[in-house]
Curated annotation (Swiss-Prot):
Entry GO terms, CC: extracellular region
Keyword annotations from UniProtKB, A to Z: Disulfide bond, Neurotoxin, Postsynaptic neurotoxin, Secreted, Signal, Toxin
Protein name, as recorded: Neurotoxin 3FTx-LI
Domain of life of the organism encoding this protein: Eukaryota
Primary role: Blocks both the muscle-twitch response to nerve stimulation and the response to exogenous acetylcholine.
Annotated organism of origin: Bungarus fasciatus (Banded krait)
Amino acid sequence: MKTLLLTLVVVTIVCLDLGYTLICYSSSMNKDSKTCQKWETVCFQEAFKPHSSGMIILRGCASSCPKGYTCCATDLCNW
């Protein structure tokens, strides 16, 4: 009985996500993603046009939303 209880406790600990980390898209060209650090709690996206021939899109993780950027706080929300 003790073995069964111990097994259940171990399985519960392994299955629980004890330190949730956010996952954000990190590339402007494709859907590459990365797991954020524990202190990074938002995904960001910023698009800007430095010249007439193209657009640059920045995506990634941040600890707070940079001014002027679009941010969200769920996995893969910054596409």
